[in-house]
Amino acid sequence: MYQTLDLNLAFTLVEPSPVVLITTRDQGKDNVFTLSLLMPLGFDDDSGCCNIAIMTGRWNHSARAMLKNKQCVLHVPTAEHMADTIAIGTVSGAQVDKFDRFGL
């Protein structure tokens, strides 16, 4: 379910550091991973972008895709998606198609 939010309040979605799902795409393959280490850096009024820092490492399959492609999508799941959010974080997209496995 999508909701419209005043972009000036976008930072409230990531303070204090919620658990999020981040999707990436590399070589035609989509992936999603669970992350809880992020923080807002600022908001650009001209572009409408909220700059966010995330903390992960090069060992992370999706982190490599983000470094290579310079893009990702951040999803803030609701409480009703808690079980799936946790489960997504227990497997690697290098071995499993998480979109297929979790019906995304």
Predicted regions and their residues:
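Active-site-proximal mixed secondary-structure blocks
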Residues: M1-T34, M39-L104
